[in-house]
C-alpha cells in the first residue's frame, strides 16, 4: 500500500504524525485494512495481507492517477509522488529516533512485510552514533534501513560526501 500520509491529510487535514487526530485515524485505517484482509481470507480461503513496501516507481503512477481523478489538492495530490506505505513524509522535520518510533506502530499493522528508512549525514567518523541508531532499530522496530551519505571518487580516491558546485556548468567538485 501507499499513501497513508496523504489519506490522513485529506480526511483529517493533518499529517498522520499529528498525535491527537492524525495518528489515531491512521491506525484505525490500518486496522480496517487488516480486518478486511481477514474477512477476505475467511471467505476465499486465500491468504491476504497488508504489505508496507517502498514503491518508488508506483507512487509516481498512483500520484498521476489521483491527480487525474481528483485534481490537485494541496498536501495530498500536489506532488509527483505519494508517500510510501506508512512512512513519514520526506518534508516533515523529525529525527531518526522519533521517526523509527512512530513508524514501528505501523509495521505491526503491516504483517505482509514492512521497511522503514532513516536518512543520516555521512557518519563514517562517528561510528558510536551509527551503532546507537542500529541498536535503536534492533530494540524498537521490526525492519529498518540506515541510509547515509558517503561517496567515493574512483579517480582520486576521496571517500566522504561529495558536493557538486554548479559554477557556470563546470560540475566542479568541492
Q: Which residues make up each language-model segment?
A:
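Long, C-terminal-biased catalytic regions of enzyme "large/alpha" subunits
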Residues: 1-174
Amino acid at each position: 500500500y501507499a499513501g497513508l500520509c496523504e489519506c490522513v491529510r485529506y480526511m483529517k487535514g493533518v499529517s498522520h504524525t499529528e498525535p491527537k487526530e492524525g495518528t489515531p485515524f491512521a491506525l484505525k485505517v490500518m486496522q480496517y485494512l487488516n480486518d478486511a484482509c481477514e474477512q477476505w481470507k475467511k471467505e476465499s480461503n486465500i491468504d491476504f495481507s497488508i504489505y508496507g513496501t517502498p514503491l518508488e516507481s508506483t507512487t509516481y503512477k498512483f500520484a498521476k492517477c489521483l491527480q487525474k481523478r481528483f485534481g490537485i489538492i494541496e498536501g495530498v495530490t500536489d506532488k509527483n509522488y505519494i508517500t510510501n506505505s506508512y512512512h513519514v513524509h520526506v518534508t516533515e522535520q523529525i529525527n531518526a529516533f522519533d521517526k523509527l518510533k512512530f513508524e514501528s506502530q505501523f509495521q505491526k499493522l503491516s504483517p505482509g512485510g514492512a521497511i522503514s528508512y532513516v536518512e543520516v549525514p555521512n557518519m563514517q567518523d562517528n561510528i558510536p552514533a551509527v551503532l546507537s541508531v542500529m541498536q535503536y532499530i534492533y530494540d524498537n522496530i521490526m525492519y529498518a534501513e540506515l541510509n547515509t551519505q558517503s561517496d567515493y571518487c574512483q579517480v582520486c580516491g576521496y571517500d566522504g560526501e561529495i558536493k557538486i558546485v554548479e559554477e557556470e556548468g563546470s560540475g566542479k567538485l568541492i
